[in-house]
């Protein structure tokens, strides 16, 4: 039951994160948003995610992991209803913000639960469970595209109906969680590593930087790839969503198959190799143009490994402070997500206006530059991983 809750939790998490790709162009059209406003919207929602990350570990110690997990799924169902009812941009923004509160709570809860359960073969099991996120992410864009064109009793679902339908799937892990018994926190209060001690460890700060740049590069694909392909290359929505699904297929297969490699060659070396590969694929796709667009999908192989590998590293390095270390790292990662999404939208708008705001070439150059920033984040992730590798090798603390 514990594993079923984790696996279903990551499936729902993947749906909620990645149905936005096909929906964003429609949302943008309905509310008449430019790229800068769209970036701001995604940043504000990342802020909701950040806020949730900051209090979820505290609630876990107060209420227990079971209640917090159920509450996270409940918030996501509620947000779906509010998104469906939203008829103005402020109401939609608030509803979307609430969904990211649920996402943040769920991410911390699943990470803590995984760290408590998977004490052996940590890298393999973390990647396996996160692989279920990839599975749902693979089909999410195609399902979202299909649902938006479905009519129920003569009424088109559109993006509002699609959101409420997909987020209602959260009821499934709730049912499993209600019947499950979850491991309690067995670390005594006096044995727990204090936050101040963790904050003095520069290795944890490197993890924050690596995770922040890696996750911005990962999550930005779900928000911007379909938009990029539809506007820059004039792809149809189904074809563009298919490329996003191909990205997540590569993403999923990498997590399901390559997890044991991280345990074998080491977590930090894995971070260097995989983030570097993702950066090369992204830059290659942009420079090569439409004929090399398949490299956008191939980039998923590399970026998929960053988050679970960082979680595995934290679980191994801080066995008596895993909850605190995860919360600290993921919360600051949320700050990076807010800034990253805002910068992507801002860069696109800035370059587009500089080249020609009303021209096709201006839009293409803006989107290329914005997507180039996504590749740059993966490259920076690789650089920080390499620096950390040198530090830990010198201290003989490589994991």
Can you annotate each of these PLM segments?
Residues 2-27, 31, 221-226, 340:
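Extracytoplasmic
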Residues 51-90:
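Conserved MFS/SLC helix-loop-helix module at the cytosolic interface between two early adjacent transmembrane helices
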Residues 265-313:
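C-terminal transmembrane helical hairpin of 12-TM major facilitator-type secondary transporters
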Residues 95-131:
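Cytoplasmic helix-loop-helix junction between adjacent transmembrane helices
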Residues 20-21, 201-248, 252:
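Extracytoplasmic gate region of multi-pass secondary transporters
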Residues 52-64, 254-266, 348:
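Helix-to-loop junctions at the C-terminal end of transmembrane segments
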Residues 120-121, 125-182:
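Helix-loop-helix hairpin linking two adjacent transmembrane segments in secondary transporters
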Residues 32, 64, 85-90, 119, ...:
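Helix-breaking motifs and short loop linkers at transmembrane-helix boundaries and internal kinks
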């Amino acid at each position: 039951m514990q594993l079923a809750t984790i696996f279903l939790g990551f499936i729902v998490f993947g749906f909620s994160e990645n149905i936005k790709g096909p929906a964003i162009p429609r949302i943008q059209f309905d509310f008449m948003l430019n790229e800068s406003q769209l970036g701001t919207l995604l940043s504000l929602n990342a802020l909701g995610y950040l806020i949730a990350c900051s209090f979820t570990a505290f609630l876990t110690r107060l209420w227990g992991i079971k209640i917090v997990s159920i509450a996270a799924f409940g918030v996501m169902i509620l947000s779906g209803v509010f998104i469906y009812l939203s008829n103005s941009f402020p109401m939609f923004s608030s509803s979307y913000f609430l969904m990211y509160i649920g996402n943040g709570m769920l991410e911390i809860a699943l990470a803590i639960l995984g760290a408590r359960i998977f004490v052996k073969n940590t890298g393999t099991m973390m990647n396996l469970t996160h692989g279920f996120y990839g599975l749902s992410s693979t089909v999410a864009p195609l399902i979202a595209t299909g649902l938006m064109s479905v009519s129920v009793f003569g009424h088109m679902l559109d993006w509002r109906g699609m959101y409420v339908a997909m987020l209602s799937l959260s009821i499934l892990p709730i049912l499993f969680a209600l019947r499950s018994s979850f491991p309690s926190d067995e670390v005594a209060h006096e044995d727990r590593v204090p936050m101040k001690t963790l904050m003095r460890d520069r290795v944890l700060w490197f993890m924050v930087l690596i995770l922040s740049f890696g996750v911005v590069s990962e999550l930005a694909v779900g928000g911007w790839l379909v938009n990029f392909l539809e506007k820059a290359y004039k792809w149809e929505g189904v074809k563009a969503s298919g490329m996003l699904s191909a990205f997540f297929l590569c993403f999923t297969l990498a997590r399901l198959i390559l997890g044991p490699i991280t345990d074998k060659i080491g977590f930090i070396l894995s971070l260097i190799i995989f983030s570097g590969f993702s950066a090369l694929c992204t830059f290659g796709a942009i420079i090569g143009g439409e004929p090399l667009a398949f490299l956008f999908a191939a980039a998923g192989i590399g970026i998929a490994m960053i988050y679970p590998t960082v979680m595995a590293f934290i679980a191994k390095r801080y066995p008596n402070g895993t909850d605190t270390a995860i919360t600290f790292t993921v919360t600051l990662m949320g700050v990076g997500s807010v800034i990253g999404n805002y910068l992507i939208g801002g860069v696109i708008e800035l370059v587009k206006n500089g080249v020609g705001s009303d021209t096709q070439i201006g839009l293409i150059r803006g989107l290329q530059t914005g997507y180039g920033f996504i590749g740059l984040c993966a490259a920076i992730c690789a650089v920080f991983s390499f620096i950390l590798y040198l530090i830990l090798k010198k201290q003989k603390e490589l994991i």
